[in-house]
Amino acid sequence: MVVEADKKALICSFCSKKQHEVKKLIAGPAVFICDECIDLCTDIMKEENKVALKQITSSIPTPQKICGILNDYVVGQDQAKKILAVAVYNHYKRLEYVQSGNNDVELNKSNILLIGPTGSGKTLLAQTLAKILDVPFTMADATSLTEAGYVGEDVENILLRLLIASEFNIAKAQKGIIYIDEVDKIARKSENPSITRDVSGEGVQQALLKIMEGTVASVPPQGGRKHPQQDFVQLDTSNILFICGGAFMGIDSIITSRTNHSSIGFAANVNMDKEKNNSEILKSLEIEDLTKFGLIPEFIGRLPIVTTLDELDKEALITILTKPKNAIVKQYQKQFELDDAELVIDDSALETIAEKALAKKTGARGLRSILEHLLLDSMYKVAELKRQRVTITKEVVNGLVEPIMTSLISTKSNKKQPIIADIPA
C-alpha cells in the first residue's frame, strides 16, 4: 500500500527519511520503505547477480578439459561426454554474453536429454558436471511429479530443492543445474492426445514446459501444499540448465519398426536388425521416435540436445570396478584399510562380478550391491579381528567358498598398501 502525503508524518524504516523527503513510502507490517531504498536494493541485487555470474563464467573449463575430468570418473560414453562438454560450456558462455548486455543476437538455452540403459552413467555424468563447474545441483525423480492440484509433488518443488542446494542464494540458484531422472516415465499413455486427464504423464510434461524454457516461478520455501499462506520466492529459470535422463525401455522397437518400414517382406533385413544391440539401434534415434514413445512435441522442443549412451559391456564394468578415482573396489579397500586390514580381489573374481551385473541387466549400478553382498560377513568380522587380509576369488563370487581370511603381520613402519588387481588385456 502507498502512503500519500496527506497522512500523518512517517519515516522510512531503512534510511529514516521522512515522507516529505521522498516520493513514496511503501507500508508493510509495522515498517515502511521509501522509493530510494527500493532502487538501492534493486541495484545491489543486480550487482550481486553480476558477481555470482562472473565467478561461474570466469572459471569455466574448455570442452576438452571438461571431457578430461569426466574421464576420471565416468568410463566409456566418449561421444556423450563430448556432446555434454560442449553443451555445458556453451550454456555458461551464453550466460556471460547475456549478462554483458550485448543482445544483438539472441542465444537460446539448450537443455539436454540423455537416453541410455539403466546403470550406463546418466546420473553420474550430470553429478560430475555440476562438481566440475561448482554450481548448485539437484536431482528430481519424474515419477513422483504430478500436475498441480493432484496427489504428488508439484514441479515447483524441483526449484525448491535447487534453492536449498544453493543455501537460498537466489543468484546462485538461477545459474544451477537440475537433473530430472526417469523422464521416460512421464510419457503419455498413448500416442494420440487423450480426452481424459493424464496427471502423471502428459500433465507433468505440460507443467515442466514453462520452467524449462525460462520463466519467473513462484517457489514456496516451505513446500507448496502444507503451507499455503507463506510468502513465495521468485526464481528466474531462464539460465538454469535442465538435464533429463531416462532408459526409454521399448524405444528400440519403435526405431527398428521405423527403419524397417521400407523393407517389409524382406526377412533378411529384419534379421540383420535383430542382431544389432540396443546401443547401435539408439544411434538411429529421430524426434518422431520420441513422439511415438509418448513425449509431447513441445516437451521435446525444450530439449534440443539429445544424446544416447552405450550399454556397458564386461570390459567396461571391470574398468568401472577398478580404474576411476572413485572406483567401487578402491572405496571398499579404503574401508578395510581403516580397520588395519587388506582387501584383495583377483582378476577372475572381477570378471565374474562383471558377468553377474550383466546378467542382472543393472549395469554399473548393480556392481555395488554384488560387492556389498560378497563382503558383508568379512566387514562384520574384520572390525574385531583386525590385521587381516581378505581375498576374493572367482569361487567366492560364485558362492562355492567363503572369502579367504589370513592374518597380516603389519607394523606402523611397514604398512601394506591396498592392492588392485590388474585388468586383463
Swiss-Prot record:
Binding site for Zn(2+): C12, C15, C34, C37
Ranges of residues in domain ClpX-type ZB: 1-53
SMART domains (alphabetical): AAA (SM00382), ClpB_D2-small (SM01086), zf-C4_ClpX (SM00994)
GO cellular component, as recorded: HslUV protease complex
Domain of life: Bacteria
SUPFAM superfamilies registered for this protein in UniProt: Glucocorticoid receptor-like (DNA-binding domain), P-loop containing nucleoside triphosphate hydrolases
One Gene Ontology term of the molecular function aspect: ATP-dependent protein folding chaperone
GO-annotated biological processes: cell division; proteolysis involved in protein catabolic process
Amino-acid positions noted as binding ATP in the UniProt annotation, renumbered to this chain: P117, T118, G119, S120, G121, K122, T123, L124
UniProt cross-references to InterPro entries, sorted A to Z: AAA+_ATPase, ATP-dep_Clp_protease_ClpX, ATPase_AAA_core, Clp_ATPase_C, Clp_protease_ATP-bd_su_ClpX, ClpX_bact, P-loop_NTPase, Znf_CppX_C4
Keyword match Endoplasmic reticulum: no
Function field: ATP-dependent specificity component of the Clp protease. It directs the protease to specific substrates. Can perform chaperone functions in the absence of ClpP.
Quaternary organization: Component of the ClpX-ClpP complex. Forms a hexameric ring that, in the presence of ATP, binds to fourteen ClpP subunits assembled into a disk-like structure with a central cavity, resembling the structure of eukaryotic proteasomes.
Listed NCBIfam families: clpX, PRK05342.1
Family annotation (PANTHER family): ATP-DEPENDENT CLP PROTEASE ATP-BINDING SUBUNIT CLPX-LIKE, MITOCHONDRIAL (PTHR48102:SF7), ATP-DEPENDENT CLP PROTEASE ATP-BINDING SUBUNIT CLPX-LIKE, MITOCHONDRIAL-RELATED (PTHR48102)
Similarity remark: Belongs to the ClpX chaperone family.
Name of the protein in question: ATP-dependent Clp protease ATP-binding subunit ClpX
Species: Rickettsia peacockii (strain Rustic)
Lineage of the organism: Bacteria, Pseudomonadati, Pseudomonadota, Alphaproteobacteria, Rickettsiales
